[in-house]
UniProtKB/Swiss-Prot annotation:
Name of the protein described by the UniProt record: Uncharacterized protein aq_2144
Amino acid sequence: MKLLEKIKERTKGFRLPSLSLSPKTSLSVFLTPEFVRIMEVDREGNNTFEPVEVDLSGKSETERLNLLAEKVNELGIRGKVAHTCITARNGILKVQKFPSTLGKKELQEAIDTMINIEKENLKEESIYDYFIQETEDKKFKIVYLVLVRKLAYENLKKFLEGAGLRLGIVDFEITTLVNAGLHLNLKIPFAILYVDFHESIFLYYTDQSLTYNVLNFSFREYLETKEEFILEDFFIEVKNQLIINEVSTLYLAGKAVEYDEVLDKILTNLPILSPLEPPNASASFLIPYILCMRGFEG
């Protein structure tokens, strides 16, 4: 299992492997309680079939599994490896910086302490993964630690395998969004506001830090009620994040980009540079697209 993979270094980019044994296509399945999105691309990033979204809102566990299995059969992807990610609400990501002068043993002890503290904070059985990235000036080593609820991972695995798929890379939604920014060559540092049916996220990434917040805004609730105070509270919450993180501009990603009326209001009230969209697909398939790209790297 690869919970975290890596946050890609700018110098390495998002190049795909040139080995002849690398897969010709890569499949991703982004599963949440609200929806499932299925996408497969070739090594040039072209879709092998039209990306699919199935609404799962209000469905029972059995209904959700049956809908996914039906779509897997319909698309002819049964038995394939599917790359996926665990949503931000089902885990945490912590970043800590250590001096490069720290010895290997001392660094490992510090990481172990970090893991134990966060496991206690989560207060339930969890699975963790981490990787270490050195800063460009070689002065610090940055540890990215992800812990996710074990039950969330097991349920995700059960659903995908129950629908006839094989589990591939399991990433974390936050690092997938960061990798989206790097893949799209956003200038570092960058901030992304991700707004979708299942959750809304504010994320700020620099070459030495990563902060994020899962926001209170429910995009689906707003669409159903059209209550303007919901949107107004959302704008206040985002502006507070901009102030706290000293950010002046941000990019917009997620399903909200596809709703013109909502998009206009967001662009009017927040300092959005531009919406983020994958090539050859709508904005809601940004995460599935990045997961597909990850799949090529193994």
